[in-house]
């Protein structure tokens, strides 16, 4: 069923058509009705079109916008340690806090929540092959190297592969990668927490508010106009 607002809009449109038909005569009435109907539909299209555009653009790589780059560690809920990308292209969740191989650079792929993750020390991207195994690649342009960040109700983050929907980045209690085909969003193995590397300070933390001292103001009346004048010191 349509909303009351839509029904009211249609009723008003019909009334307007009838009024114009009465003024313009029988020959002009139907044409006016068609023109008004097209205008009415055009006024309702932009919202749906914009929503469709957002959905379509969130599924493809954004080549126009400036990419947001973040640096942090991924703390594994099951292993109790951090995800690392080693020089031998192995990926596990066995790194201690502050380990240089646990420092990850996360690049946004779209204006949505899709990202590419690479090791800051090795420059290798975390990807997933057709068997659901996590692999490291020097070229992360493929869709298999794109993950969708999903913030869960427990405040943990899950990373779902963009190419293999329903397959997640996951690690066992021993920090070994788990095949994406055996993962589900509710499993602890796919839950991660973002943490800043040890000793890393964000720009926001280094900023301090600066307050400017202005003399106090009092209100005075000059004739019929109100002005502001500083208090005498």
UniProtKB/Swiss-Prot annotation:
Effect noted on mutating residue 40 to L? In HH6; phenotype consistent with normosmic idiopathic hypogonadotropic hypogonadism; some patients also carry mutations in FGFR1
Q: What is its main location?
A: secreted
Q: Which InterPro entries match?
A: Fibroblast_GF_fam, IL1/FGF
Q: Which disease is it linked to?
A: Hypogonadotropic hypogonadism 6 with or without anosmia: A disorder characterized by absent or incomplete sexual maturation by the age of 18 years, in conjunction with low levels of circulating gonadotropins and testosterone and no other abnormalities of the hypothalamic-pituitary axis. In some cases, it is associated with non-reproductive phenotypes, such as anosmia, cleft palate, and sensorineural hearing loss. Anosmia or hyposmia is related to the absence or hypoplasia of the olfactory bulbs and tracts. Hypoplastic femurs and pelvis: An autosomal dominant disorder characterized by isolated bilateral hypoplasia of the femoral and pelvic bones.
The record's section on Gene3D superfamilies has: 2.80.10.50
Q: What's a Gene Ontology MF term here?
A: type 1 fibroblast growth factor receptor binding
Q: What is the effect of changing residue 14 to N?
A: In HH6; phenotype consistent with normosmic idiopathic hypogonadotropic hypogonadism
Q: Which organism is it from?
A: Homo sapiens (Human)
User: At the top level of its lineage, which domain of life is listed?
Assistant: Eukaryota
Effect seen on changing residue 116 to G: In HH6; phenotype consistent with Kallmann syndrome
Which family is it part of? Belongs to the heparin-binding growth factors family.
Glycan attachment points: 155
The record describes its quaternary structure and partners as: Monomer. Homodimer. Interacts with FGFR1, FGFR2, FGFR3 and FGFR4. Affinity between fibroblast growth factors (FGFs) and their receptors is increased by heparan sulfate glycosaminoglycans that function as coreceptors.
Q: Please name the PANTHER family in this protein's record.
A: FIBROBLAST GROWTH FACTOR
For this protein, the record's CDD domains field holds: beta-trefoil_FGF8
Which purpose does this protein serve, as stated in its record?
A: Plays an important role in the regulation of embryonic development, cell proliferation, cell differentiation and cell migration. Required for normal brain, eye, ear and limb development during embryogenesis. Required for normal development of the gonadotropin-releasing hormone (GnRH) neuronal system. Plays a role in neurite outgrowth in hippocampal cells.
What name goes with this protein? Fibroblast growth factor 8
Q: Which cysteines are cross-linked by disulfides?
A: none
Q: Mutating residue 89 to E: what's the consequence?
A: In HH6; phenotype consistent with normosmic idiopathic hypogonadotropic hypogonadism; some patients also carry mutations in FGFR1
Q: Which residues constitute the signal peptide according to the record? A: 1-22
Q: Which UniProt keywords apply?
A: Developmental protein, Differentiation, Disease variant, Glycoprotein, Growth factor, Hypogonadotropic hypogonadism, Kallmann syndrome, Mitogen, Secreted, Signal
Q: Has the keyword Cell wall biogenesis/degradation been applied to this entry?
A: no
One Gene Ontology cellular component annotation? extracellular region
């Amino acid at each position: 069923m349509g909303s009351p607002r839509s029904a009211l809009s249609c009723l008003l449109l019909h009334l307007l058509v009838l009024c114009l038909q009465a003024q313009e005569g029988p020959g002009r009435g139907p044409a006016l009705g068609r023109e008004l109907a097209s205008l009415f539909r055009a006024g309702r299209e932009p919202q749906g079109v914009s929503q469709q555009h957002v959905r379509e653009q969130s599924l493809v790589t954004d080549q126009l916008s400036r990419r947001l780059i973040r640096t942090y560690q991924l703390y594994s809920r099951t292993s109790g340690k951090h995800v690392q990308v080693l020089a031998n292209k192995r990926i596990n969740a066995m790194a201690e806090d502050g380990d240089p191989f646990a420092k990850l650079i996360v690049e946004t792929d779209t204006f949505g929540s899709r990202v590419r993750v690479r090791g800051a020390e090795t420059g290798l991207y975390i990807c997933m092959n057709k068997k659901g195994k996590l692999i490291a690649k020097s070229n992360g342009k493929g869709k298999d190297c794109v993950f969708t960040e999903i913030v869960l109700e427990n405040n943990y983050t899950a990373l779902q592969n963009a190419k293999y929907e329903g397959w997640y980045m996951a690690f066992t209690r021993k920090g070994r990668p788990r095949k994406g085909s055996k993962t589900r969003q509710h499993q602890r193995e796919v839950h991660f927490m973002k943490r800043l590397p040890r000793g890393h300070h964000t720009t926001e933390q280094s900023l301090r508010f600066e307050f400017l001292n202005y003399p106090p103001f009092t209100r005075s009346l000059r004739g019929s106009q109100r002005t502001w004048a500083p208090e005498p010191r």
